[in-house]
Amino acid sequence: MRTKQNNAGNFKKKSIYIIPERSKINKFCTELTGITPQLIEEKGIYFEEACEKIKDEYHSAQLTWAGFGNFDKEQIMEQCDYLGIENPFSENYINIMYQFKKYNGLFKMMGLKRALHFMNMDFEGNHHSGADDAYNAARILREILR
């Protein structure tokens, strides 16, 4: 689940679906994310493959990466440790939630949808879809960096 800015300043969405190894896709997961067992069966790859793909396609070890909060970063680090593989990302990480709070002089953190609303932006796509969440977080970061 990545976003990449093209030369026009627009973001391009791309999803990588991971085959779960310690759980199954259940009804709750499907309702929350839109990911179905059939989608994973058709397009899913193992976490290790996804890490290699990210390294190869994005040269991610050399780039700063970002997320809205630390949850995704921690999950990636934990899974890499669990599997004994190298994290495909650099140590340079931007916590967009924290930067948003700091930029706006807020005392409390807020979720992605509320942060967008605070900036007079609508959430685009499906909340909890990795690609859509990444896209919307990138929109916030772009506004902060202007």
Map each language-model feature to its residues.
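Metal-dependent phosphoesterase signature
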Residues: 31-53
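Metal-dependent phosphoesterase core characteristic of DEDDh/y 3'-5' exonuclease domains
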Residues: 2-35, 55-146
